[in-house]
């Protein structure tokens, strides 16, 4: 693709689009859950703060080796990677001891080939540090600490949050529509509210982890983000994307300077690759459900990761063309074939349309 083609296509895609949807219904009991197992894996970015807690005086607070190794872990892997790996084990989400046992005996060769990759190699590079720190946390009474000090705060945040079942039903109706023929769990993604994270991330077993900060209306208003936005976003990660589509994305990266420059910046945030597709789909679903207006759609594209997801507004612009029964993956492959593939002239037409709108305005 000629480098100049993607930019005008992006500019044209930023024009407002309205959408609507019918609300659905559904029952989603036990939407929120807690997990001592995931929380113990998420402590490393906050190791210094944890060691200073009076509960750990004389144990972690006096163990400089623990802190040194925790810092090493934090510099190499993210909590989302550790939680994702443990999610594949089938172990208890409530028992930190099972986490200790899993990482002490973990064999990367036992993993399915499809989940292996650089992230597993990164975890393996700090296996000794992980084993030591997890054992020290267990010995210092982390399970008791979590029950007494972490869990009550999480339960309070959960109890204060209110959501209507019909809202969840409408969301999952939209996600099922985007899935095409792909089967999805009818009750949606299980949500773990963790005390040791300040973000949200999806897990490979179609569940996801979320900070309790997103359940607080005041925090949501302050940072212009709310739990339902994150819930939609993370559930959209359940949609399958084919190797063929990812190859198309790589071809674009290899052949388009404009896209490559922005994609490199997105990757620096840890949000590259197919993340632009999910961002576009979240805005599309939220707009169809009437949760946001056109200005909020545009604002998200401009500010999310500093506007680096240049494909997101293009995908959003054409999502209304999703065919009946077509999967999100099928739609994206068709979009690449007809609109973003190398050599097409759509970008030039979009540039002419954009200039016409500017002159008319």
Regions found by a protein language model. Name each.
Residues 8-16:
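Bacterial N-terminal signal peptides
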Residues 76-174:
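Long, mid-chain structured domain cores
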Residues 150-205:
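Auxiliary, metal-adjacent structural segments of Zn-dependent hydrolase domains
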Residues 242-270:
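Post-HEXXH active-site segment of zinc metalloproteases
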């Amino acid at each position: 693709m000629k480098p100049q083609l993607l930019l005008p296509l992006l500019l044209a895609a930023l024009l407002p689009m309205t959408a609507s949807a019918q609300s659905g219904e559904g029952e989603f009991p036990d939407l929120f859950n807690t997990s001592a197992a995931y929380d113990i894996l998420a402590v490393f970015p906050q190791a210094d703060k944890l060691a200073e807690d009076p509960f750990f005086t004389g144990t972690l607070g006096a163990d400089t080796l623990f802190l040194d190794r925790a810092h090493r872990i934090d510099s190499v892997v993210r909590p989302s990677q550790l939680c994702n790996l443990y999610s594949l084990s089938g172990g208890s989400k409530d028992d930190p001891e099972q986490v200790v046992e899993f990482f002490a005996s973990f064999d990367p060769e036992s993993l399915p080939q499809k989940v292996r990759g650089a992230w597993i190699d990164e975890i393996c590079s700090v296996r000794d540090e992980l084993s030591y720190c997890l054992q020290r946390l267990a010995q210092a009474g982390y399970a008791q600490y979590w029950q007494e000090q972490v869990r009550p705060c999480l339960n309070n945040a959960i109890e204060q949050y209110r959501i209507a079942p019909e809202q969840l039903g409408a969301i999952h109706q939209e996600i099922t529509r985007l899935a095409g023929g792909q089967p999805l769990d009818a009750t949606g993604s299980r949500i773990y509210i963790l005390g040791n994270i300040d973000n949200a991330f999806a897990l490979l077993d179609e569940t996801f982890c979320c900070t309790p900060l997103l359940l607080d209306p005041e925090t949501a208003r302050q940072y212009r983000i709310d739990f339902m936005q994150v819930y939609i976003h993370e559930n959209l990660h359940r949609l399958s994307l084919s190797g063929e589509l990812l190859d198309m994305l790589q071809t674009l990266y290899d052949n388009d300077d404009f896209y490559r420059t922005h994609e490199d910046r997105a990757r620096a945030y840890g949000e590259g690759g197919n993340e632009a597709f999910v961002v576009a789909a979240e805005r599309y679903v939220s707009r169809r459900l009437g949760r946001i207006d056109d200005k909020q759609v545009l604002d998200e594209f401009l500010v999310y990761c500093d506007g680096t997801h240049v494909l997101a507004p293009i995908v959003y612009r054409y999502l209304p063309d999703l065919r009946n029964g077509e999967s999100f993956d099928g739609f994206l492959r068709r979009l690449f074939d007809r609109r973003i593939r190398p050599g097409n002239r759509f970008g030039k037409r979009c540039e002419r349309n954009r200039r016409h709108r500017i002159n008319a305005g």
